[in-house]
Amino acid sequence: MINQKKIAGEKACEWIKDGMVVGLGTGSTVYYTIEKLGEMVNNGLHITGVATSEETSKQAQNLGIPLKSLNDVAEIDITIDGADEIDTDFQGIKGGGGALLREKMVASASLKNIWVVSEEKLVRNLGKFPLPIEVIPFGWKQIERTLEKEHVQTILRRQSSGEIYVTNNGNYILDIVNQTFRDAEMWQEKLAQIPGIVEHGLFLHYVDIIVCAKANGEIELIKK
């Protein structure tokens, strides 16, 4: 069986050159990117990684990829990350893995952003996948009520154990469900006005190249 995630994840490594500072995303597709980069580092490639989550940091360290924090780099040459959905206008939803805040900060500091996906992630309109919003624990219920008044349904993210999911930043995640985000700019503005929302998973002006693996194993490169 063809592993689309592995194909897309490894393909993106072709953009990585010696001496680069590389943003390392989080998720099941970019996992393969990081594995491949670890192999390349062990074969002599010199890069510095900036991890977007504790999970990614642990994986990179285990593979021998040198890391620095975002505070310690002036800019990032390329960030490779996954996405939950991408529409035809290069707008995306990210954060299914809970790392949306750090992912967006790293993406903002990057000269180029590459997203690695399998073809089912390409959609006409955003919204089939829930939109995560990271909120501070204090008063999170009030944020939920505020959105309910706007007829926006949210679900507090929990772990499989039933405990509340807590991000690497100590925050909670509310997932907006049953909603289509045709006017993503409007949604971005709406969410930015609600106190207590730290960040949302709409990534509207970030991606430069999409590496999409198809079911037959072929790669499609979609450039902005």
From Swiss-Prot:
Keywords (A to Z) from UniProt: Isomerase
Recorded superkingdom: Bacteria
Annotated catalytic residues: E103 (proton acceptor)
InterPro entries assigned to the protein according to its UniProt record, in alphabetical order: NagB/RpiA_transferase-like, Ribose-5P_isomerase, Ribose5P_isomerase_typA_subgr, Ribose5P_isomerase_type_A
Known catalytic reactions: aldehydo-D-ribose 5-phosphate = D-ribulose 5-phosphate
GO molecular function, a single term: ribose-5-phosphate isomerase activity
Annotated residues for binding of substrate: T26, G27, S28, T29, D81, G82, A83, D84, K94, G95, G96, G97, K121
Pfam families cross-referenced by the UniProt entry: Rib_5-P_isom_A
Keyword Isomerase: yes
Pathway as given in its UniProt record: Carbohydrate degradation; pentose phosphate pathway; D-ribose 5-phosphate from D-ribulose 5-phosphate (non-oxidative stage): step 1/1
An example Gene Ontology biological process: pentose-phosphate shunt, non-oxidative branch
E.C. number(s) listed in UniProt: 5.3.1.6
Keyword Isomerase appears in the UniProt entry: yes
Top class in the EC scheme: isomerase
Stated family: Belongs to the ribose 5-phosphate isomerase family.
Function noted in UniProt: Catalyzes the reversible conversion of ribose-5-phosphate to ribulose 5-phosphate.
Quaternary state and interactors: Homodimer.
Protein name listed in UniProt: Ribose-5-phosphate isomerase A
Gene that this sequence comes from: rpiA
